[in-house]
Amino acid sequence: MVPRLKEKYQTEVVPALMQEFQYRSVMQAPRLEKIVLNIGLGEAIQNSKALDAATSDLAAIAGQKPVITRARKSIAAFKVRQGMPIGVMVTLRGPRMWSFFDRLVNLVLPRLRDFRGVSRRSFDGRGNYSLGLREQIVFPEIDYDKVDKLRGLEVVIVTTAPDDEQGYALLKRLGMPFRD
């Protein structure tokens, strides 16, 4: 079964982008490549249970098992040794990516406190978009009563767009609520 948003992308978004940017081929139109979710855990150094809680939260949000990220270098100021677990991340592609993006745009972002749209300035110059969420409880998959601590997470949306303008056009047409 094709995700709802992917169908919209193929039937509405690609033709609109082809017309706007005068692409010669359908393959030139920018598309979502992957979505990376990351929770950085500074407290994992003292509290190893924090890692398990963050892993289960991210697994519930993403629908697949996250990988534990480890410190590349030792940093004495942060009391971090090389190889210590300092976060969890998951990379979504294919149908899971489309369904997550759909949930993010239509359920999660509107549930944020004082939400007036996401900033246009969070593009990286290569058409990719990054956004941070302050708490994981805005996701409907997370049970509020089982949360031990509020953790933020980063969401990076990687597109094939060559620049920010085309990346913005793609995400805007897919329903991303930008504040203009």
From Swiss-Prot:
Disulfide bonds: none annotated. GO terms for biological process: translation. GO terms for molecular function: rRNA binding; structural constituent of ribosome; tRNA binding. It holds the Pfam family Ribosomal_L5_C. Keywords: Ribonucleoprotein, Ribosomal protein, RNA-binding, rRNA-binding, tRNA-binding. InterPro entries: Ribosomal_uL5 (IPR002132), Ribosomal_uL5_bac-type (IPR020930), Ribosomal_uL5_C (IPR031309), Ribosomal_uL5_CS (IPR020929), Ribosomal_uL5_dom_sf (IPR022803), Ribosomal_uL5_N (IPR031310). One of its GO terms (cellular component) is ribosome. PROSITE patterns: RIBOSOMAL_L5. The keyword RNA-binding applies. The keyword rRNA-binding applies. Belongs to the universal ribosomal protein uL5 family. Part of the 50S ribosomal subunit; part of the 5S rRNA/L5/L18/L25 subcomplex. Contacts the 5S rRNA and the P site tRNA. Forms a bridge to the 30S subunit in the 70S ribosome. This is one of the proteins that bind and probably mediate the attachment of the 5S RNA into the large ribosomal subunit, where it forms part of the central protuberance. In the 70S ribosome it contacts protein S13 of the 30S subunit (bridge B1b), connecting the 2 subunits; this bridge is implicated in subunit movement. Contacts the P site tRNA; the 5S rRNA and some of its associated proteins might help stabilize positioning of ribosome-bound tRNAs. This is Large ribosomal subunit protein uL5. It comes from Roseiflexus castenholzii (strain DSM 13941 / HLO8). The lineage of its organism: Bacteria, Bacillati, Chloroflexota, Chloroflexia, Chloroflexales. The gene is rplE.
